[in-house]
């Protein structure tokens, strides 16, 4: 199952270095791959979170169509740009990395984050709280995943 959040803004970031500075300013331990400028990304973006590999999809979208899709009544402003962050898979870092990257991008561009699952808009400050909550939960998720993997390995040996 894939999850999606969107950011809306009136300007874009010109480089990965600018985006990375915004991420660093939030104090996130996320490092983006820097081989392609954000304006040319339309697909999977690789990175590292706390030294571990992570990825999420990053797609530019038509802002007006995306606001219409999300429910135009939710927006008090016609944004110029929209980007989707999509993640899924088995890597527990992906959701946290996507929220961190989206939060930093939204704050750096004066934008907002939209979580379609909740149907809710988040200011950059509120999105920061979500990203921090997800980050604090990572050690427990890692522990649970390791426990589950050990259990599965034991069950395989017994059969």
Regions found by a protein language model. Give the residues of each.
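Acidic (Asp/Glu-rich) sequence patches and key acidic residues
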Residues: 1-159
């Amino acid at each position: 199952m894939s999850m999606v959040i969107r950011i809306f803004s009136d300007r874009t970031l010109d480089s990965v270095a600018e985006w990375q500075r915004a991420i660093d300013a939030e104090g996130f331990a996320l490092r983006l791959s820097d081989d392609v400028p954000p304006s040319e990304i339309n697909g999977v973006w690789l990175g590292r979170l706390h030294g571990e590999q992570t990825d999420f999809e990053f797609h530019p979208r038509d802002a007006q169509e995306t606001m219409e899709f999300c429910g135009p009544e939710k927006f008090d402003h016609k944004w110029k740009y929209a980007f989707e962050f999509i993640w899924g898979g088995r890597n527990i870092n992906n959701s946290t990395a996507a929220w961190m990257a989206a939060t930093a991008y939204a704050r750096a561009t004066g934008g907002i984050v939209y979580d379609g699952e909740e149907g809710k808009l988040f200011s950059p400050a509120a999105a920061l709280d979500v990203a921090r909550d997800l980050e604090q939960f990572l050690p427990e998720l890692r522990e649970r995943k390791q426990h589950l993997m050990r259990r599965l390995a034991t069950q395989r040996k017994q059969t």
